Structure formats: C-alpha cells, structure tokens
Amino acid sequence: LVHRDIKPGNIMITPEGKVKVTDFGIVSLQNEESDITKTGSILGTASYISPEQAQGKPVSKESDLYSLGTVLFELITGRPPFEGDTPIATATKHITDKPEKLSTYRADIPKGIENAVLKLLHKYPKDRFKNAEDLRAVLLQQKTQLQAIQTQENLVDLTSPKIKYRFTLPALIISLSIVVGTIWT
C-alpha cells in the first residue's frame, strides 16, 4: 500500500501511546492505478507531499517515506521543511529547494537523527531509505542519544477536543519508527 497523504493530522496517538495511521482515502496499491489516482493526478497535502507526487509522477513506498520525513522534520523543528504562500508554491519547494538542517533549529538533535530525516527528504526516491525497516533500524540505533535529550522542554503537546496528551520528543520519534516498520514492510 502507498498511503499518499502521510501528515500529522493522519497520525494519531492513543492514550496508551500507540501510533495509528488514519485516512486511507487516497491510498493505492503499489503499481496499481485507478481513474481517480492515475499518473498525472496530484493528490496529497502540499506541506507533506513528495516531489514525485507534486509533479504528478508515479508514487511508491519511498513517497510515503518522504512524507514521513516531513512529519519528523516538523516534529523536531516545530515547522514543516517547506512553506510557501500558496499550496502550489509549497509543493514546488518540495521539488526545487533543499531542506535546512534540523540542527539549525535544535542543536541538541543527534546527528544520526538529523541525517536520517535529511535522507528521507532527498528529492529522488532512489536516494532515500530503500525500505521502512532500514529507517526503523537507524532510528532505533539512536534511542540512547534521543533519551539523553529528554527534558521538560522537549515535551510535545498533542491536543484533541477532550484530552491533552504529553509525550517527549524522543518517545514520539521512537513510536513513529515502530509504526514505520509495520505499515511499509
């Protein structure tokens, strides 16, 4: 499956801390097209869309991994990697612009995490992680370094209308790495 709309709004965290991906409305089976989702159609959310999606090219699991990279970038820095005045301007930046280093915003982020996120954000699918298991392995290798930066200032608020959850940044990154291994493998 290729989800094609991985974004913070489609990633839910249960009260128990389990990560769930939702909204499979524009999902496709890899190597399969329908009239609604054929090559040339642009589907997805501009802030989280892969370069190939923004160009209407075929998508793959690497496209979803790119989108996950945008989510991790925003989770760590507090902002998406690319912003424009319009959705089209934002989508164009995914094609043309290079993302800033995460350490520009957070000096305490381990180099291994920064490198993993930047690898996810490569413009060409062949330059990204080959599969979710490779990404998951790299993120789990960084678990000790992530836990070392766990401070009160690293708490991330996830708010729903009724319940407010607080998770540390390292816990969220590790949880996302686990969900990555289950969705795209």
Where are each of the predicted segments found?
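C-terminal lobe helix-coil module of Hanks-type protein kinase domains
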Residues: 45-146
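C-terminal or otherwise distal, non-catalytic regulatory regions appended to signaling enzyme catalytic cores
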Residues: 153-185
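Activation segment of protein kinases
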Residues: 15-58
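Conserved catalytic-loop position in the HRD/HxD motif
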Residues: 5
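Juxtamembrane amphipathic/hinge helix adjacent to a transmembrane helix
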Residues: 145-154
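Conserved catalytic-core element of eukaryotic-like protein kinases
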Residues: 2
